[in-house]
């Protein structure tokens, strides 16, 4: 029985001050979906008996089988704060009434799917960060938290799996307190690293109620605020004073009936307030239930005035424990209260998020409407991903209304990522067929949706690839494109078993690239269809979807292949020169490597082609030691106008130079997209144009003359500058017990990996090993690792950086690198030998 109707939800949507949009983020297997279950049970969407095992937000069959979340799923819940006192505690925000609408998105934890997390974060304002008590803050916790803070999203923390610490590790109260406090400290360290002025201090403090402790599996959780409320009523003291005392170094002395900061009294140790007032009752319940002392349990229940249902009283052991703890500290109430009190409403959040969300000027009508979350302003809606419908081949567009109101039948401008105001490209004007409310795997039809809510749209999937902006204002710019922290580095090629199925495959590939924000599909010159993904697991899931859903035909799939990047190791040994086909124009160029930190700054979007060129020149001169005149004359970034290669104009007093600028830049984009060695993209090369000699007649220096010449001279300059290949490298974090560490080292050394850090988690027998592992060597790594450690090691790998491929020059066919290049060229259907620079270099 669902506890709310769609009409009630619709009524709440009109009060944006009472809406909370939040996503649940965490490391893999820290219990996001399990925690979400208890919230769903509270809202009556699933039965409370199932909560904790249903993982109701894992809607796909393969998610249930593998026990992992693959796609992020949205669900809307209805929550109330019955107590007037509580509503007064909502700091710095207005509220209207005591009913709240919570739009919750459960996101995956595997690093392969972190683009799903980005899509979820974009449409929410708050994040519930789940951390495992035993494992603490892991690599993926850090990644998702960094993504959240980058989107200006306010975090609150849940420390999950506390039952494990009590039942498996049998820790003492003080140890548990110390482990909590260590975990919270490491979360706060990450938060303070990415401090953002406009967001203010968002560190989490248990004594302010922004940290909850609990167990998703058993369905209980508490914040210090809840206990403070209980004791405040009992002892008649002020609740906020009580909250401060229940965390940190505060002790209650039962002899003098006073609070002190000093941990000893008359030579005896006093018990910390957190342990005495909060952990003690929990520990008592655990020991009474797990040691099967029926009478003690009954006494405790009476003391806490809890009434158990009749069938719950008959239970024993863990089942009884679950029932008692659920009655004593229900997780849903605790989490709902924390979200309502501490997460921002859309009205509050959009005021400071508008500048990071909107590309246009911050004072036009669209930006103002976003800042005030105005339902009457022009419609501004960002679609962050596509969700497949039950009807094959159609998609819901999933996004958030930032301003205005979206309704069925409304005519909107659908702006793709390359749209610029005033131009016609990447723009469609179409009517929205229906608006729906996303409820896990199902959808509920709804007439309209005001600003600040999360929505599904039907009928615009044909006009958007993966994400984009919907608006009714003709002057509105786009919402900023999402930055993904992973890049597709692993490829496999796909072929059909029966030739007549080819059209279905092509159609299927289109649908696949729609349904996943981070998958790339393209076909290369030899006619292969290639699918690229973020990692082995991601690719496996995508190809599975392709075969069974999107294309629905049997496929043959090649072995995984790694994407390389081409680069140079030194400066060109001589100036490269090329003549145009009609011999009237000459270009002179040299290539040299870019500094690694500059490449990273470009890839992270800190330095972009859209910056003001004077400001950019300042940064390049101050931080990277560039010559100021060079830094002002950067012609282009490539490939795709934003990659980490630069084209710099160093010419002096050349006639007609500006007329050929576009042609040279086109040639540069072409050359950097597919380099001379194996037609792989280039990275971290700086090309300097030294001199240009042009024909006086405009007709002899058109694009057809200049573009191929520019490409040839770029190739020659690259081949003269000690060309080499870069391979992608994963950062692997492995959690492993001490006795199995030898096996891990063995597997890593066999695969050219090197370990650069290991530390023990205090209070557990687990070690965390950090290592770099080339992507090329990572296929089948998980299986090997499990075999070597008999299943005790848990690896988590994420793309980290590019590294030069060792083993000789790519031009020498006998070396190791040369052989990789030959394989690559053979696969692409090119001549096997890498052409020498003579092919591109023209003598004077």
UniProtKB/Swiss-Prot annotation:
Query: InterPro entries, alphabetically?
Result: EFG_II, EFG_III/V, EFG_V-like, EFTu-like_2, G_TR_CS, P-loop_NTPase, Ribosomal_Su5_D2-typ_SF, Ribsml_uS5_D2-typ_fold_subgr
Q: Which residues form the tr-type G domain?
A: 17-255
Entry's PROSITE patterns? Answer: G_TR_1, G_TR_2
User: What job does this protein perform?
Assistant: Catalyzes the GTP-dependent ribosomal translocation step during translation elongation. During this step, the ribosome changes from the pre-translocational (PRE) to the post-translocational (POST) state as the newly formed A-site-bound peptidyl-tRNA and P-site-bound deacylated tRNA move to the P and E sites, respectively. Catalyzes the coordinated movement of the two tRNA molecules, the mRNA and conformational changes in the ribosome.
Could you tell me which residues carry Diphthamide?
A: 700
Gene symbol of the encoding locus: cot-3
Annotated Gene Ontology cellular components are: cytosol; ribonucleoprotein complex
Q: What class of enzyme is it?
A: hydrolase
Question: Where does this protein hold GTP?
Answer: 26-33, 160-163, 215-217
What PANTHER family does UniProt report for this protein, alphabetically?
A: EUKARYOTIC TRANSLATION ELONGATION FACTOR 2 (PTHR42908:SF10), TRANSLATION ELONGATION FACTOR-RELATED (PTHR42908)
Q: Which organism is it from?
A: Neurospora crassa (strain ATCC 24698 / 74-OR23-1A / CBS 708.71 / DSM 1257 / FGSC 987)
Give the similarity note. Answer: Belongs to the TRAFAC class translation factor GTPase superfamily. Classic translation factor GTPase family. EF-G/EF-2 subfamily.
Is ATP-binding one of the keywords?
no
Lineage here is: Eukaryota, Fungi, Dikarya, Ascomycota, Pezizomycotina
Q: What is this protein called?
A: Elongation factor 2
């Amino acid at each position: 029985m669902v506890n709310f109707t769609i009409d009630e939800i619709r009524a709440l949507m009109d009060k944006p001050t009472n809406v909370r949009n939040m996503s649940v983020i965490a490391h893999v297997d820290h219990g996001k979906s399990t925690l979400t279950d208890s919230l769903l049970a509270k809202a009556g969407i699933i039965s409370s008996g199932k909560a904790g095992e249903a993982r109701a937000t894992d809607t796909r069959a393969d998610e249930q089988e593998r026990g992992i979340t693959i796609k992020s799923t949205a669900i809307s819940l209805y929550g109330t704060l019955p107590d007037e006192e509580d509503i007064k505690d909502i700091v710095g925000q207005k509220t209207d009434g005591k009913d709240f609408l919570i739009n919750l998105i459960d996101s995956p934890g595997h690093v392969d799917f972190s683009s799903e997390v980005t899509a979820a974060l974009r449409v929410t304002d708050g994040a519930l960060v789940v951390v495992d008590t035993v494992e603490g803050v892991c690599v993926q916790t850090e990644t998702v938290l960094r993504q959240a803070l980058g989107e200006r999203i306010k975090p609150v923390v849940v420390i999950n799996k506390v039952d494990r610490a009590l039942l498996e590790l049998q820790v003492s109260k003080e140890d548990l307190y110390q482990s909590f406090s260590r975990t919270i400290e490491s979360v706060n360290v990450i938060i303070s690293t990415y401090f953002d002025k406009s967001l203010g201090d968002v560190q989490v403090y248990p004594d302010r109620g922004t940290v909850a402790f609990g167990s998703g599996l058993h369905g209980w959780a508490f914040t210090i605020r809840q206990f403070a409320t209980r004791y405040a009523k009992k002892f008649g003291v002020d609740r906020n004073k009580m909250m401060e005392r229940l965390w940190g170094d505060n002790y209650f002395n039962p002899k003098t009936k006073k609070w002190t900061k000093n941990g000893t009294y008359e030579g005896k140790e006093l018990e910390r307030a957190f342990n005495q007032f909060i952990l003690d009752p929990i520990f008592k319940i655990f020991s009474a239930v797990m040691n099967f002392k029926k009478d003690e349990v009954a006494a405790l229940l009476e003391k806490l005035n809890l009434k158990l249902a009749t069938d719950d009283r008959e239970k024993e052991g863990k089942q009884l424990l679950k029932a008692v703890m659920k009655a004593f500290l229900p997780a849903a109430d605790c989490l709902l209260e924390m979200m309502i009190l501490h997460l921002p409403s859309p009205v509050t959040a959009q005021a400071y998020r508008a500048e990071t969300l909107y590309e246009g000027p911050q004072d036009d009508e669209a930006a103002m409407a976003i800042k005030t979350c105005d339902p009457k302003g022009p419609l501004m809606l960002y679609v962050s991903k596509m969700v497949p419908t039950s009807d094959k081949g159609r998609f819901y567009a999933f996004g958030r209304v930032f301003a205005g109101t979206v309704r069925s039948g409304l005519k909107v401008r659908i702006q793709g990522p390359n749209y610029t105001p005033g131009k016609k490209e990447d723009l469609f004007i179409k009517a929205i067929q229906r608006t729906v409310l996303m409820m896990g795997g199902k959808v509920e039809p709804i007439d309209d949706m005001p600003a600040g809510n999360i929505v599904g749209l039907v009928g615009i999937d044909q006009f958007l690839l993966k994400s984009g902006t919907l608006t009714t204002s003709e002057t509105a710019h786009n919402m900023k494109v999402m930055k993904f922290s992973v890049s597709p580095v692993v490829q496999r090629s796909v072929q059909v078993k029966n030739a007549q199925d080819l059209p279905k495959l092509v159609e299927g590939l289109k649908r696949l690239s729609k349904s996943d924000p981070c998958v790339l599909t393209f076909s290369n010159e030899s006619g292969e269809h290639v699918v690229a993904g973020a990692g082995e697991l991601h690719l496996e899931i995508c190809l599975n979807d392709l075969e069974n859903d999107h294309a629905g035909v049997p496929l043959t799939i090649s072995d995984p292949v790694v994407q390389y990047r081409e680069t140079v190791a030194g400066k060109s040994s001589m100036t490269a020169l090329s003549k145009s086909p009609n011999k009237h124009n000459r270009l002179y160029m040299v290539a040299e490597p870019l500094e690694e930190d500059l490449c990273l700054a470009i890839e992270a979007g800190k330095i972009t082609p859209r910056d003001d060129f004077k400001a950019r020149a300042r940064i390049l001169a101050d931080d990277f030691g560039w010559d100021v005149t060079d830094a002002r004359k950067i012609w282009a970034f490539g490939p795709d106008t934003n990659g980490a290669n630069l084209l710099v104009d160093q010419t002096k007093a050349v006639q007609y130079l500006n007329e050929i600028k576009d042609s040279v830049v086109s040639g540069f984009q072409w050359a950097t997209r597919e380099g001379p060695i194996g037609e792989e993209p280039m990275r971290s090369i700086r090309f300097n144009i030294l001199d240009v000699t042009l024909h006086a007649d405009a007709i002899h220096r058109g694009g057809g003359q200049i573009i191929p010449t520019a490409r040839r001279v770029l190739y020659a300059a690259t081949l003269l500058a000690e060309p080499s290949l870069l391979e992608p490298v994963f950062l692997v974090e492995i959690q492993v017990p001490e006795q199995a560490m030898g096996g891990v080292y063995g597997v890593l050394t066999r695969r050219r990996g090197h370990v650069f850090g290991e530390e023990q988690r205090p209070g557990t027998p687990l070690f965390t090993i950090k290592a770099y592992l080339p992507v090329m060597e990572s296929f089948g790594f998980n299986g090997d690792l499990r075999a070597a450690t008999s299943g005790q090691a848990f690896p988590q790998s994420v793309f980290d950086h590019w590294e030069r491929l060792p083993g000789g020059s790519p031009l020498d066919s006998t070396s190791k690198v040369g052989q990789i290049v030959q394989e690559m060229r053979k696969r692409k259907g090119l001549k096997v030998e890498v052409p020498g620079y003579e092919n591109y270099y023209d003598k004077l």
